[in-house]
Amino acid sequence: MATINMTPGDLELGRDRGRIGKPIEIPLLENFGFDSQLGPFYLGFWNAVAYITGGIFTFIWLMVMFAQVNYNPVAFAKYFVVLQIDPPSSRYGLSFPPLNEGGWWLIATFFLTVSIFAWYMHIYTRAKALGIKPYLAYGFTGAIALYLVIYIIRPVWMGDWSEAPAHGIKALLDWTNNVSVRYGNFYYNPFHMLSIFFLLGSTLLLAMHAGTIWALEKYAAHEEWNEIQAPGTGTERAQLFWRWCMGFNANAYSIHLWAFWFAWLCGITGALGVFFSMPDFVNNWFQWGIEAGINYPQGPTPPVSLP
């Protein structure tokens, strides 16, 4: 039987320390794959800042779009996906424009950024308080890097807020497509290639890990710490299954390392791919692909003869 060495005092956090409410049992949650316990909820300073600033961003975003349809709830629901808050036009550069010409976008982006960093501090400080390593916060930096490059770093580098996407569902998709078209097709962007590789790879790793543990539930393979050291258990069967099918085994620890790095690198390489898509670095990824030898040069159009 495995023993867990716990540093004395790590979990002696007191009765309150920012917790809100008492735990309650909701058995219905178990039908959706969750634990039945709900709460207690920890607020704390950073979490409060994250929720307040995130709420302000959401309020500005929704109300500005609501005003665009003259506060018509039917039209708001109908066109919600295509409504957006546009950034300032290129003539304003990095200056602060009137509210209805991009000012609301700047204000909303400020509160969104504060909310994201406050949430990072919340999960970091909570991990430290529990005596665990803040790897969840470290993983979150991959998403933060991509966000900062798209909304702040790249537009500031180019001296133009209009290079950032609008706040909206369809608007973000349109921005991604437009940047790809302007800079010669993202398919030839090596960082985009890596980002998609890590995106699909992390999805595959998660599916492989989840499928293996789910398949061995009847052997209690989800109790990994005790399972991994005993013969004939679900975990041993999982290791044998991987060796039989793939020739090697990723254990309950290493599979999470693989998944972490794949997911983190998805955001980091995506951020690099977006950042280098500008005239100062790469103006045409298709031409870059030709020069890098991963794409055929464009030849002259063959003559067309009509009968």
From Swiss-Prot:
Membrane topology listed for this record: Multi-pass membrane protein
| Keyword Glycoprotein (UniProt) | no
Its localization reads:
Cell membrane
Q: Which cystines does this chain contain?
A: none
Report keywords, A-Z: Bacteriochlorophyll, Cell membrane, Chlorophyll, Chromophore, Electron transport, Iron, Magnesium, Membrane, Metal-binding, Photosynthesis, Reaction center, Transmembrane, Transmembrane helix, Transport
* Top-level taxon in the UniProt lineage: Bacteria
UniProt entry tagged with the keyword Electron transport: yes
* Listed Pfam families: Photo_RC
Q: Mind telling me which residue stretches traverse the membrane in this protein?
A: 45-69, 103-123, 133-153, 196-216, 257-277
The record's section on InterPro entries has: Photo_II_D1/D2_sf, Photo_RC_L/M, Photo_RC_L/M_CS, Photo_RC_M
The residues the record assigns to binding Fe cation are: H209, E236, H256
Q: Name one GO biological process term.
A: photosynthetic electron transport in photosystem II
Query: Which PROSITE patterns does this chain map to?
Result: REACTION_CENTER (PS00244)
Recorded hits in NCBIfam families, A to Z, give: pufM (TIGR01115)
Give the record's family classification: Belongs to the reaction center PufL/M/PsbA/D family.
Q: Name the chain's protein.
A: Reaction center protein M chain
Q: Which residues are reported to carry the modification Blocked amino end (Ala)?
A: A2
What is this protein for, i.e. what is its function? The reaction center is a membrane-bound complex that mediates the initial photochemical event in the electron transfer process of photosynthesis.
Q: How does it assemble?
A: Reaction center is composed of four bacteriochlorophylls, two bacteriopheophytins, two ubiquinones, one iron, and two highly hydrophobic polypeptide chains (designated L and M).
Gene Ontology cellular component terms for the protein in this record: photosystem II; plasma membrane; plasma membrane light-harvesting complex
GO molecular function per UniProt: bacteriochlorophyll binding; electron transporter, transferring electrons within the cyclic electron transport pathway of photosynthesis activity; metal ion binding
> Where on this chain does (7R,8Z)-bacteriochlorophyll b bind?
H192
